[in-house]
Amino acid sequence: MKSKCVIIAGEFSADVIGVEIMSAINNIEWYGIGGPLMDAKKLNKFYDWDKISAFGLSDVIFSLPRLYYYASKIADKIIKINPKIIVTVDTKGFNFYLIKLIRQKLKTN
């Protein structure tokens, strides 16, 4: 049985790094968010990465409701999968919030 792992990459440079990580580790069932390179490696996608992408201060501010919504949905999916590890690549602000949210949800369950 393959181990389940989650990887979150929200932009092209993260997709490049993410596919290298996925290629280096065998016998893993990968879940998460990535781009076309990670898709080609059979990533079980939660959502398209445009759901968690925002560039520039004004885009981030206007995207906050969407980012919070998807962070909550992604956290629920990760908790349900119960992965061995969670790998986050780039999109630091979103990923830090996501990990914090997962911890909070696990404490309340």
Task: Go through each PLM region and give its residues.
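Active-site and donor-binding regions of nucleotide-sugar-utilizing enzymes
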Residues: 4-109
